[in-house]
């Protein structure tokens, strides 16, 4: 077997762009968004339907922040705007178990990621298992498996793709919403090292293992 290459396709669902066939890709990532899953946008319901179709077809799904919430809501969970406001900056998250079979966790099971959210999952879909939590966010991640134990869903509240520079600019752009004191405190955390490389490895392992076991990898 030669080297494998990963090809990424981008679909701007907010513009109504979805894959023409559910099996157009071996797996899907539902990314972050400025929108809330409970808001009335023309693309929200089609996205919910797409997530359900992919899940029913056992196609691996990764949800990050908004994606974490969208997958939860689409599959029967509940998402609300959190009354305590925004969770921003680098935050430690306690993992209850490895996010993927045989994945490595730090010795203390605490993973640091950058967070940007004002919404939270308050009820998980039926059959989902909580993966992680923090002092600010009770459901900071969850997983779902098929009836024969193949993991098809990995959802994370934190942003492994964010870095300090981008996060600083984003905080500046939403300071009026987050509040000056909370923005200042969040910026102070951005000097901390995150575990994004570790989480990136988990994500690669999740898609590779799930797609191979389900027989949907090319």
Predicted feature residues:
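Short, glycine/charged-enriched secondary-structure capping and boundary segments
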Residues: 23-25, 42-45, 75-79, 127-129, ...
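Short, flexible loop segments at the rims of nucleotide/cofactor-binding pockets, characterized by
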Residues: 5-9, 38-40, 90-92, 108-110, ...
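N-terminal beta1-alpha1 cap of cysteine-dependent amidohydrolase-like domains
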Residues: 1-57, 180-218
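Amide-donor transfer/coupling interface in amidating biosynthetic enzymes
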Residues: 12, 95-218
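Flexible, glycine-rich phosphate/dinucleotide-binding loops
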Residues: 17, 37, 70, 139, ...
């Amino acid at each position: 077997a030669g080297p494998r290459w990963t090809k990424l396709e981008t679909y701007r669902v907010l513009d109504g762009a979805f894959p023409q066939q559910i099996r157009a890709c071996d797996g899907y990532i539902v990314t972050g968004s400025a929108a809330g899953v409970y808001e009335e946008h023309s693309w929200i319901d089609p996205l919910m339907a797409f997530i359900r179709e992919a899940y029913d077809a056992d196609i691996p799904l990764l949800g990050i922040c908004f994606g974490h919430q969208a997958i939860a809501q689409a599959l029967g969970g509940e998402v609300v705007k959190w009354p305590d406001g925004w969770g921003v900056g680098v935050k430690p998250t306690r993992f209850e178990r490895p996010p993927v079979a045989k994945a490595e966790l730090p010795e203390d099971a605490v993973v640091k990621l950058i967070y940007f959210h004002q919404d939270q999952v308050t009820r998980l879909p039926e059959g989902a298992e909580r993966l992680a939590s923090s002092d600010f966010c009770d459901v900071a991640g969850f997983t779902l498996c098929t009836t024969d134990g193949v993991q098809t869903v990995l959802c994370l509240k934190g942003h492994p793709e964010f870095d300090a520079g981008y996060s600083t600019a984003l905080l500046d752009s939403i300071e009026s919403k987050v509040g000056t004191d909370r923005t200042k405190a969040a910026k102070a955390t951005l000097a901390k090292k995150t575990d994004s490389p570790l989480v990136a490895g988990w994500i690669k392992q999740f898609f590779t293992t799930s797609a191979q076991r389900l027989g949907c990898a090319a």
